[in-house]
From Swiss-Prot:
GO molecular function, one term: 4 iron, 4 sulfur cluster binding
GO BP term, example: L-leucine biosynthetic process
CDD domains: IPMI
PROSITE patterns in the cross-refs: ACONITASE_1, ACONITASE_2
Domain of life: Bacteria
Pathway annotation from the record: Amino-acid biosynthesis; L-leucine biosynthesis; L-leucine from 3-methyl-2-oxobutanoate: step 2/4
Its EC number(s): 4.2.1.33
Protein name (record): 3-isopropylmalate dehydratase large subunit
UniProt source species: Shewanella baltica (strain OS185)
Amino acid sequence: MTNAKTLYQKVWDAHIVAAPEGEAPVIYVDRHLVHEVTSPQAFSGLKVAGRKLRAPEKTFATMDHNTSTRSASLDALSPMARTQVETLAQNCKDFGVRLYDIHHPNQGIVHVMGPELGITLPGTVIVCGDSHTATHGAFGALAFGIGTSEVEHVLATQTLRQLKAKTMKIEVRGHVTDGVTAKDIVLAIIGKIGMDGGTGYVVEFCGEAIEALSMEGRMTVCNMAIEMGAKAGMVAPDQTTFDYLAGREFAPKGEDWAEAVAYWKAIKTDDGAVFDAIVELDAADIAPQLTWGTNPGQVVAIDGKVPDPINEANPSTRASMEKALEYIGLSAGTPMTDISINKVFIGSCTNSRIEDLRSAAVHAKGRKVASGVTAIVVPGSGQVKAQAEAEGLDKIFIEAGFEWRLPGCSMCLAMNDDRLEAGDRCASTSNRNFEGRQGRGSRTHLVSPAMAAAAAVAGHFVDIRKPY
């Protein structure tokens, strides 16, 4: 087929405002998501220059990174956190931006509340001053993180200069086996191509295993596209997408809905479209995954062992492995199921949606958190929290000894009062296991919600495909 285009190319082409020869094209931004950490300087820049927002109705703000998951009171925040949330509130008031503050029933992690409110739509360009903006690509949107200076530029112009990325197709063929989740799929992908395997690319995830995922699962996969170095991750919209969006607050209604769906159905990669790179995996080969090191690419199956750097031919990779093992406090050859933990975190923009909490609750129900283990469950938004409580999931967790918290980014990053102490070893459903990510000297192992809950009750990592 001549002129065949990929999903990314179609969305990109539809948003070019100007493409001066020899310069980066200018693209239009449909939705701009804002939070308290990366926006203060951007708003200050506008005030200094005397500029207004170009499109305040296309800008949506929430408080998530620094908020407390124990209390909705400003008094629960550190002085710096309080300054940031109060500054965001004032900036939103001054510039006419819709804000979901800590008292709003829909407040939550920006990448959880955006989709559930229908702010995220197929074929749109979405930006946010946050690296995990790729999450929204699950809807067939082109979504990526931007820096604070770019946040200011989008606020002022609703556009952005961007170089076009290369295209990569990651096809996960066939179907996963029981116990294998979207988190396991994306960790397996990162383990295969490495944390820089997607650098310079926008990745389209496809194949039967991806198509079979719910929207929550697709968001988990796209969320971690950045962890393989990609600019963004995308999944073509389909009936699963449309069913999820129907009736949501900011989704089209009535005749506009029918017209939108007709357009969205055309936003898919054409037959014969050429990708710059192709990666293929067999879903049946993917087992529950567990990171052993200090980046998401240092990952193995739960029935595996901590790898031995001596078997790595590349000197640079070998040195990285040795450094990771020293920090993480593990010995090569240790079975993954022999690794004990003392902390569990179920939450983050990767895995804090209702499907994630249901999955974790299956392993918590009728059990008790192991002695010496502290486990917290942090729903991704007010909507998720309310739905989970309506389903009785909170009671399952609380009766098992988990702490049930308020929405927020929480222990994903050591930016609020939920953090690990030096030497703590945590089973975490978040997206990064870097040195110190969850607190100075903390040791993080990335897993699915089901694996995290199972580790909480066992006191060590277990293969959830087997009795434990």
